[in-house]
């Protein structure tokens, strides 16, 4: 899948929450 910037920002933010 090709992510838009916005989508990437949200995915990375959610991933960060999971990590911590």
From Swiss-Prot:
Please state what the protein is called: Sperm acrosome membrane-associated protein 3, processed form
Encoding gene, per UniProt annotation: SPACA3
What's the stated role of this polypeptide?
Sperm surface membrane protein that may be involved in sperm-egg plasma membrane adhesion and fusion during fertilization. It could be a potential receptor for the egg oligosaccharide residue N-acetylglucosamine, which is present in the extracellular matrix over the egg plasma membrane.
Q: Which family does it belong to?
A: Belongs to the glycosyl hydrolase 22 family.
**Domain of life, per lineage:** Eukaryota
User: What is the additional note?
Assistant: On the 2D-gel the determined pI of this protein is: 5.3, its MW is: 16.8 kDa.
Q: Please report the organism this UniProt entry assigns to the protein.
A: Vulpes vulpes (Red fox)
């Amino acid at each position: 899948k090709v992510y838009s910037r916005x989508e990437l920002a949200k995915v990375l933010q959610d991933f960060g929450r999971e990590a911590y």
